[in-house]
Amino acid sequence: MKLFGFGSRRGQTAQGSIDHVYTGSGYRIRDSELQKIHRAAVKGDAAEVERCLARRSGDLDALDKQHRTALHLACASGHVQVVTLLVNRKCQIDVCDKENRTPLIQAVHCQEEACAVILLEHGANPNLKDIYGNTALHYAVYSESTSLAEKLLSHGAHIEALDKDNNTPLLFAIICKKEKMVEFLLKRKASSHAVDRLRRSALMLAVYYDSPGIVNILLKQNIDVFAQDMCGRDAEDYAISHHLTKIQQQILEHKKKILKKEKSDVGSSDESAVSIFHELRVDSLPASDDKDLNVATKQCVPEKVSEPLPGSSHEKGNRIVNGQGEGPPAKHPSLKPSTEVEDPAVKGAVQRKNVQTLRAEQALPVASEEEQERHERSEKKQPQVKEGNNTNKSEKIQLSENICDSTSSAAAGRLTQQRKIGKTYPQQFPKKLKEEHDRCTLKQENEEKTNVNMLYKKNREELERKEKQYKKEVEAKQLEPTVQSLEMKSKTARNTPNRDFHNHEEMKGLMDENCILKADIAILRQEICTMKNDNLEKENKYLKDIKIVKETNAALEKYIKLNEEMITETAFRYQQELNDLKAENTRLNAELLKEKESKKRLEADIESYQSRLAAAISKHSESVKTERNLKLALERTRDVSVQVEMSSAISKVKDENEFLTEQLSETQIKFNALKDKFRKTRDSLRKKSLALETVQNDLSQTQQQTQEMKEMYQNAEAKVNNSTGKWNCVEERICHLQRENAWLVQQLDDVHQKEDHKEIVTNIQRGFIESGKKDLVLEEKSKKLMNECDHLKESLFQYEREKTEGVVSIKEDKYFQTSRKKI
């Protein structure tokens, strides 16, 4: 997702997150998500779009699965004809997709300027925002299209629109390092004083993202260089923390120009204030001011100060008050003060004080005896003066050390705060780079600490060196009074007559000098008090800033801990879900193996049933053939017997009767044998029919799953029942014929016993022949029934095979559906 945080050094990871949102050539289009009108809009087929609208006018604003209309897809693909067609049909122009992007935003995102112009001319709103809070102008800034931005602004786009990170298009152009767009937006009067969520100004962001060209443009626009963010850091602090010396020099030069302008404006008022102090007289100050000067200065100066002290003027004032102001100190390149007084009023007072001391030295008369005594007293007081100077200088050295310590600690604290606030804020880095970023921040903090320690050591060495130089200077000043006393003695010897005149002039010069010094002392005291108040205010401000930074650090640490806990919880939850899925996968695999085994077993059972059925059918056909052959043989034997009987003579009736009785007995035996075989075959058929019924019952249990095949099965079963009924009728008729045959046999027996005439025999034979014909008719009917039974069995077998295939396919479909639902 989009994160406009500034987490990496000069915005590298933030730039990557921005690119993730703003780059891309359009939508990811899947054909399954689109309707016909959407496919035509993607292809740019205006004729097909018009046909779709003619068929169904409701497709004009139809949405796909990603909530995109045909206008969205046409704008993303840059098809101007389709866009004009849809707009002329008065479709919804400001409809939003799943990312809350309008067709105008999508056209600007894909840099389709012609489509964007058509939408703007037909009243598209350029100030609508997507889910990231970006307007069409933000996307135009990213693509660095000034023409698109110009058209958006001319159609009412808000130039100060804010995204989710409170970035205006100008700030966003600075983040993306789009120098051309920065110049364009500033020409269109975009506000250069806008700030983001962390209250960072445009200049701070330009420094942060290492854009010296943009910094130069902003400085030309007279941007506020002294503006501060939430943590109290300005643009120069950003340049120092990121080691950007070039940008730091640009900012310093701009600050110097601003200070020069302010000094030129304030100079006249400072000179008037100094002239008022020069008009002060000697009586306006108490006599104890000169004695208490050092004490007052010591009390006014705080122990730790962060502002520079007026060191040069303070030293000169001490020398003059302590009696060492007879001559100016020798200038040395190594003795330059480390801090300079920026106030022009104080500089003017110090310069005028030095001029007065020089004049007093030039106007000194030749010393008389009183002057010699005074010099002797001053020589006696010289060790005390030396001790005072030494104490003052040692205090100055300690004070400068405290200043160095405070500045170094403040710098280190500021850098660590900058690292903490600027680097651990949750929007600064992506979650994947968090550990690497923490390591980098620790390394940078350690480097900054080492740099601060090195600076402290260097400053300490410089202070020690300056202390030695001050000691040498004090020794030289101690020798100056002795030399001057000798010179004064020689001058007194030469100029004794003019002693009174020179004494009067000397007193007058000293009085004037005293007035000037008192005025300078008052100025310095007031300045010291103001500096003290400023330092106290700054200390309070720094303490408040430190508290705020500590609170923010604590909040950020809590946020980091919460994030870590959430990450661990989500990882644990995902691990549990993964384990559950693995277990379910193993269970499903086991079920699949069981299903495969059961399927194989059922297939084997079906094959065995098929083989058994085929064997039973073949046995049944063989038995029918044997029965048919037996019947034919019986008919042949009957025909032969009839022919023999007809050809035999009447005289041989007894022999023929005996022969017939023998034949009848033989045929009866054969008939009985055939009857037994018929019974056996019938029993076997019954068994096989029972087996078929069991198979049909098994099949009926499986057929309950499919409702459509049930009717066919019932019809087939009804036909089988009819055939079995017919078969039972045939059996009953066969039994009836057997009974008739038995009755005929009994009649033959009676004939043999009674020895009746041939007519009875012929009648019996005729009845036997008729019964044979009836048997043939019954056999034909039984053949037809057997054929019907075979046809029904074949249809049943085919039906069972189709049914098993359908059941297997249904089971497989159900299994895959259940497995998909579980997954």
Swiss-Prot record:
Entry annotated with the keyword Repeat: yes
Location of the region described as Disordered in the Swiss-Prot/TrEMBL record: 301-343, 355-402
Record gene name: ANKRD20A2P
ANK repeats: 66-95, 99-128, 132-161, 165-194, 198-227
Bias type Basic and acidic residues, positions: 372-384
Keyword Ribosomal protein among record annotations: no
Pfam family, one: CCDC144C
SUPFAM superfamilies associated with the record: Ankyrin repeat
Listed PROSITE patterns: ANK_REP_REGION (PS50297), ANK_REPEAT (PS50088)
PANTHER family per the UniProt record, alphabetical: ANKYRIN REPEAT DOMAIN 36-RELATED (PTHR24147), ANKYRIN REPEAT DOMAIN-CONTAINING PROTEIN 20A1-RELATED (PTHR24147:SF1)
Coiled-coil residue spans: 431-480, 565-724, 776-805
Keyword list, A-Z: ANK repeat, Coiled coil, Repeat
InterPro entries for this protein: Ankyrin_repeat_domain (IPR050657), Ankyrin_rpt (IPR002110), Ankyrin_rpt-contain_sf (IPR036770), CC144C-like_CC_dom (IPR039497)
Name of this protein: Putative ankyrin repeat domain-containing protein 20A2
